[in-house]
């Protein structure tokens, strides 16, 4: 009986002691993290004191939301060369927008910034974009032949076919005078192109109602990944996976992976046919996916399923979304500068007449159109920034230095709007790219630069030329004055309110 009388008291004392211990441990951990946060921030302030910065919140940093580009352009004019941007917590990055600074960083072999790019891994895996070191070099060397001019030449006709499908859809619209949000159409068109060129897809995804689910998943992942990078709490995978954003991200990843898995499965099935297999093996240059399927690594083994899907996911995203962004912004730039649009149209007509076919040789015969495309990519670079994590200290030409471990972000948008290298940077002036106009080798980087530049830059540039040439033959592009696009910082440059144009049929 005595035991039963005292047990509840002892039990309560035990529970109370447990909670006291848990509270003290939690308090210790909070204090430890607070001290760690303070010391890290003080170290960063000292180490990067030569890089100016505007006042920021101690926890949220420079919370720019969707005003990032407006603020960045202010910094570019106010702080020559580079400046400091505080993100959430003790995270910071040095923004570089001077060609001399950019040249130094791109001339090194620093890895991609893990604190930023790691959040892409659940989506695109470790393909060319995220790989570093020896494995990156092996994959880059393996995939470079997929962009040999011998491969790219026949792609021009495929690109033209995809563009014409999009233009046919535009011609069938009931109300030609009503502004159209063009990015949706352009995104499906570039996806159609990359599916046919790189993945031997038959048919057209532009005519497949289910294809919209993939482009919508990519759009969602663009936004969700960007928000996660900027969040003070979503860096923790447990917290992120429990959040509504985490659940949306997993669902979008599932949709994207189902799409790419289907592409791989379909091509593998085609290669089970002996005739198709022999046809592929006899090619002088293999397509992108066939290179991956036939690849042998240095150990003699085939590419793992994980590596295979990572490269397919990476190129499926980069091969269509960045190009769709570029084409959409070029269309907008031409719509708002009708005199340049008309000059491009006249140039294209002089080469193609009223035809709908474009050849490889035609692409070098439209210099003014090419100048306009390049100027639009200067104003609206599809990838607004790239980041590196310094593997060793770096010193710039003016003597300022950054220690190992710091993230440097090459702010391509700021670089392209730097008034020290681009007079009147907000003005659309294609003559900047005339053959006799000199410029710094690293002042213009729409496809990044250095050893890790965009492997598909020639593919993308060809597609831009084909899309612009064929569109100008069939439509006059007019702006919607009620909805002026607002550039928005994401993984790929987007507009906060879409890109709306009026399309006037020419024939």
Swiss-Prot record:
Catalytic activity: an omega-methyl-long-chain fatty acid + reduced [NADPH--hemoprotein reductase] + O2 = an omega-hydroxy-long-chain fatty acid + oxidized [NADPH--hemoprotein reductase] + H2O + H(+); dodecanoate + reduced [NADPH--hemoprotein reductase] + O2 = (11R)-hydroxydodecanoate + oxidized [NADPH--hemoprotein reductase] + H2O + H(+); dodecanoate + reduced [NADPH--hemoprotein reductase] + O2 = 12-hydroxydodecanoate + oxidized [NADPH--hemoprotein reductase] + H2O + H(+); tetradecanoate + reduced [NADPH--hemoprotein reductase] + O2 = 14-hydroxytetradecanoate + oxidized [NADPH--hemoprotein reductase] + H2O + H(+)
Classification via PANTHER family: CYTOCHROME P450 4A14-RELATED (PTHR24291:SF47), CYTOCHROME P450 FAMILY 4 (PTHR24291)
Reported impact of residue 318 to A: Loss of covalent heme binding
Predominant location category: endoplasmic reticulum
Enzyme Commission number(s) of this protein: 1.14.14.80
Keywords: Endoplasmic reticulum, Heme, Iron, Membrane, Metal-binding, Microsome, Monooxygenase, NADP, Oxidoreductase, Phosphoprotein
Subcellular location: Endoplasmic reticulum membrane; Microsome membrane
One example GO MF annotation: long-chain fatty acid omega-hydroxylase activity
SUPFAM superfamilies, A to Z: Cytochrome P450 (SSF48264)
Description of what induces expression: By clofibrate.
Single Gene Ontology BP annotation: lauric acid metabolic process
Gene label: Cyp4a14
The protein's name: Cytochrome P450 4A14
Family in the record: Belongs to the cytochrome P450 family.
Functional summary from the UniProt entry: A cytochrome P450 monooxygenase that catalyzes omega and omega-1 hydroxylation of saturated fatty acids. Exhibits preferential omega versus omega-1 regioselectivity and (R) versus (S) stereoselectivity for hydroxylation of dodecanoic (lauric) acid. Mechanistically, uses molecular oxygen inserting one oxygen atom into a substrate, and reducing the second into a water molecule, with two electrons provided by NADPH via cytochrome P450 reductase (CPR; NADPH-ferrihemoprotein reductase).
Propeptide: 1-4
């Amino acid at each position: 009986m005595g035991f039963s009388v005292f047990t509840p008291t002892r039990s309560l004392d035990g529970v109370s002691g447990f909670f006291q211990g848990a509270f003290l441990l939690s308090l210790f951990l909070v204090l430890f993290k607070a001290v760690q946060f303070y010391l890290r921030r003080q170290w960063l302030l000292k180490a990067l004191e030569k890089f100016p910065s505007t006042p920021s919140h101690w926890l949220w940093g420079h919370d720019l939301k969707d005003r990032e580009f407006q603020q960045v352009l202010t910094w570019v004019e106010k702080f020559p060369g580079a400046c400091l941007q505080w993100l959430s917590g003790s995270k910071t990055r040095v923004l570089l927008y001077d060609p001399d600074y950019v040249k130094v960083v791109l001339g090194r072999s620093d890895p991609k910034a893990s604190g930023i790019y790691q959040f892409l891994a659940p989506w695109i895996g470790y393909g060319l974009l995220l790989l570093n070191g020896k494995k990156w070099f092996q994959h880059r060397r393996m995939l470079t032949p997929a962009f040999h001019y011998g491969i790219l030449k026949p792609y021009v006709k495929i690109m033209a076919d995809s563009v014409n499908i999009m233009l046919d859809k535009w011609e069938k619209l009931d109300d030609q005078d009503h502004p159209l949000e063009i990015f949706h159409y352009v995104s499906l068109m570039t996806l159609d192109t990359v599916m046919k060129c790189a993945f031997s897809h038959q048919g057209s995804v532009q005519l497949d109602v289910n294809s919209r689910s993939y482009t919508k998943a990519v759009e969602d992942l663009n936004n969700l990944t960007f928000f996660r990078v900027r969040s003070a709490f979503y860096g923790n995978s447990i917290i992120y996976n429990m959040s509504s954003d985490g659940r949306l991200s997993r669902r979008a990843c599932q949709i994207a992976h189902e799409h790419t898995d289907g592409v791989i499965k379909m091509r593998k099935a085609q290669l089970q046919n002996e005739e198709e297999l022999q046809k592929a093996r006899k090619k002088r240059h293999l397509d992108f996916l066939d290179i991956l399927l036939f690849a042998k690594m240095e150990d003699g083994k085939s590419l793992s399923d994980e590596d295979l899907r990572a490269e397919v996911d990476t190129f499926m995203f980069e091969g269509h979304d960045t190009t769709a962004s570029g084409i959409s912004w070029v269309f907008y730039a031409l719509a708002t500068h009708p005199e340049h649009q008309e000059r491009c149209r006249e140039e294209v007509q002089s080469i193609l007449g009223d035809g709908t076919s474009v050849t490889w040789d035609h692409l070098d015969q439209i210099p003014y159109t090419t100048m306009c495309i390049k100027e639009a990519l200067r104003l609206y670079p599809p990838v607004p920034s790239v980041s590196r994590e310094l593997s060793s200290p770096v010193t710039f030409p003016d003597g300022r230095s950054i220690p190992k471990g710091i993230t440097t972000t090459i702010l391509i948008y700021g670089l392209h709007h730097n008034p020290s290298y681009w007079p009147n940077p907000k003005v659309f002036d294609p003559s900047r790219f005339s053959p006799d106009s000199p410029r710094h080798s690293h002042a213009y980087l729409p496809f990044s630069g250095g050893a890790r530049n965009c492997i598909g830059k020639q593919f993308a540039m060809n597609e831009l030329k084909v899309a612009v040439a064929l569109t100008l033959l069939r439509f006059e592009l007019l702006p919607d004055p009620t909805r002026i696009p607002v550039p928005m910082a994401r993984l790929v440059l987007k507009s906060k309110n879409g890109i709306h144009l009026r399309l006037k049929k020419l024939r």
